[in-house]
Structures are given as C-alpha cells and as structure tokens.
C-alpha cells in the first residue's frame, strides 16, 4: 500500500501493513442509501450563522508510522482548507468545514477509542485510517453510528467485506496485488517453482497466500513456506530452507526491515532465486537496506505509478507550498478521499449521511490520483496495481 516517495525510513516500514489483512466471506451488497437509523446533520451553528461541518481524520501521528500519518493528515487538511476557501453556501447558509485530527498510533485499540471520540464529536465523515488493523475496529464503530468512512491506504480485502454501507477506499487491495504478482512471476518471469516467506502478520500472510494461489493457478509449484516476524534480525534457518528447496522465485510477504536483510543474506549464501514482494518492499529505503543484493528485486504498489497520476505534479507543488516539504506517501490519496466526500456533500447540499451517502456511493470523481468510483462493496472501481523492479539501485516500473 505504499507509493510515491515510498517512505524511506526503516523503522516505520517495519509494521505499517502488519494489519492489512486478508478478509474472507461474501460481502453484502452496498446500496446507494444511508445506513439504517442515520441521524441528521452532524453539524453545529457557528458565530454569524455559519453551518459548521465536522470531519474526522485518524492517522498515526506519533510512533513508528508518524511520518506517513502526518503526510496523510496534511493531504486531508489541504483539501479541507481549499474547500473552506471556496466560501460555500448550502441552501443559503454559509458552510465551514472543521477538521478534527486524531492520533490512532496505527493501533487497533487506540483506533477504536479515536472512533468513539469522533462519534462524541458528531463528525459527519471520517477520512482514514492508515492501516487495516486500525481501520477494521474503527469501521465497526462508525458503522454502528452511521458515519461514512473513506480510507486512502487500507489494502486489506476484509475492510470492504464487512457488509457496511458507509465504507469506501480509494486504492486497490492486497488480493489484487497478490494476483498480479503471482501471474507476473509465472507468465513474465518464467518461474516454475516458488517459495513463500511471510512475517505472520495479517498483511504479510494474506499477501503470501494470494500470491501463492495466483502463481499456482498460472502453473507454478510451491516448494516451501517459511515464517519470520516483524522484529526478526536473524534469517539463517530460512536461508538454509531456501537453499534446500531451490525455488525459481521467492515471495516475501512483509515489510522492508526484514525483507531487505533477508534478501541480503540469501544472496550472501548463494541463493539466486528471483525475489519479490508487494508494497511493503516498495520503499525508497529497500535498495539501501539490501545493498547490491537489491538489484533485480520486484515489488508492487496498489496504485498507479507517480508519472501516471494526472495531478501528481500540481499536488506536489501545492503540498510543498502549504507544508514546506515533499510528499511522503499517501497524502495525494488522502486528499482525494477527502475531496470525494466533500464533493458528495456539496452535491447533496448536506452533511447528513442520509442525504450525501447516496452521492458518495455513486461517485464519479476526477481525482489527482485518477478516476474515483466505487463498487457495491466500496472498493475502488478499476483499481490499478503497478509492478516495479530495481535497476541500478533504483526502482523502475516493470509493468
């Protein structure tokens, strides 16, 4: 689930997608109506007769993922500031958007507590959270209180398989990544045998399983499965197992703090199998961590490549002007997620989910990351997966 500058800080990447899990079960259809029992306007009058519309955004603002979370929060803030600059009126009343930003620490329990605070504050919508593990418990709270939620980086399939009418995402999911990588490994890279290694997180295991299913469907044979953890620093036993299995390709489900040194050790011990991961490895730090061993590695993102984003350059300029720094990762997606909510509210002339949720579900929004529309479950329609390889120490688009 990582893209753009791709987060060049190792400690953060250690856990970011640990909760992006593989969901199961048939999803219920999403209907273009508000959840049963939706309340009225979650707003408050302000001085001068303004209608104050409260929006919530939850991101890790402290801890290992703070740089990603702050970047995403900036994207939300930029969209809200621009909306306020429009001096909108709904039904003759001036509207002011008020952003409530909370730190969920990318932690499920904290995220649920944040969700409760948003409920108490009567927010009209939530943009976030960063990871699936935090988003799942929070989404239950929002669904119970009829608050729509649009995620900008959540890739775990289960997120949109809960049957919730007010849950959406503006990025592809992990199953799409696993499917694309599995097919690419066999059909393009020619792998006849493969091994999977994962970090035992919902994210890593889910991706590894999806990759394996797709690779086997394409005709390859799995010859080994091994496990590590998000805190591992020693990989000797795994390397020994890989030497014995001798696969054509190794898929790693996890993040770069383990994925990179694992690759380095594999190469040091003479394992020449092609090496592949998903967005947990597609970071600017991976080539540095893996050194020369990184050359020829493959990874993916659940999004379009930077140069394919229609509004990437203009957004980066606005972002730098507003915040004095470069785009880190998900701020363009957070910006789009916010704007698709605002567009639905504007069209409905209301912040009441009963009125704007049908517009949100039917969105056909031209965002800076591309066209945004939603399936009945709330997934992004026509989601894109981009596959990269490292050449000369740098990530390049492979497909």
What are these language model-derived features?
Residues 2-5, 21-399:
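Extracytosolic ligand-binding ectodomains
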